[in-house]
Amino acid sequence: MKLGDVWFSAIAEAENNDRMIIVSGRTEIEPFIQSGKFKERVEITWKYEADSKGMPNETTGKLMEEVQTVLKQAMEKDKLAIFTGIYTGDGERTWVFYTRNIPAFGRMLNETLAPFETLPLTIYTEKDPEWNEYREMCELQDQDN
């Protein structure tokens, strides 16, 4: 299976206020969903000091992009995980991955982030063999069309 790098962007609203959330979702990954190998969802959330629109400042944004790049490369190198979504706004960015193995993902995460100073990250995992979160995110793309 070849993993492409095609993404869509959409706008959503935060659940507790009217701040916008920018959503980026990966498309063309159906073979990975159908494989049944990526049953665990991992959400990595970075809370930040938000500007008046709920977005990170330039310095934080650049660091987030750097972290995102190395995480994507590390997790997808041997298809340990598939990076599927990014939510940014209302004082936090969340990266969503679907993985084959949570313990291996955790080890790779620690190894990949070791060169960085401690980051304000929280990790949430959940079994999601039907890719429900991903499918809900894709509904945002359909609403924008």
Predicted regions and their residues:
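A short beta-turn/loop motif at secondary-structure boundaries
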Residues: 85-90
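Helical (often loop-to-helix) elements that flank the catalytic cores of nucleotide-handling enzymes
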Residues: 103-118
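Conserved short beta-strand edge segments in small beta-sheet-based binding/regulatory domains
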Residues: 114-145
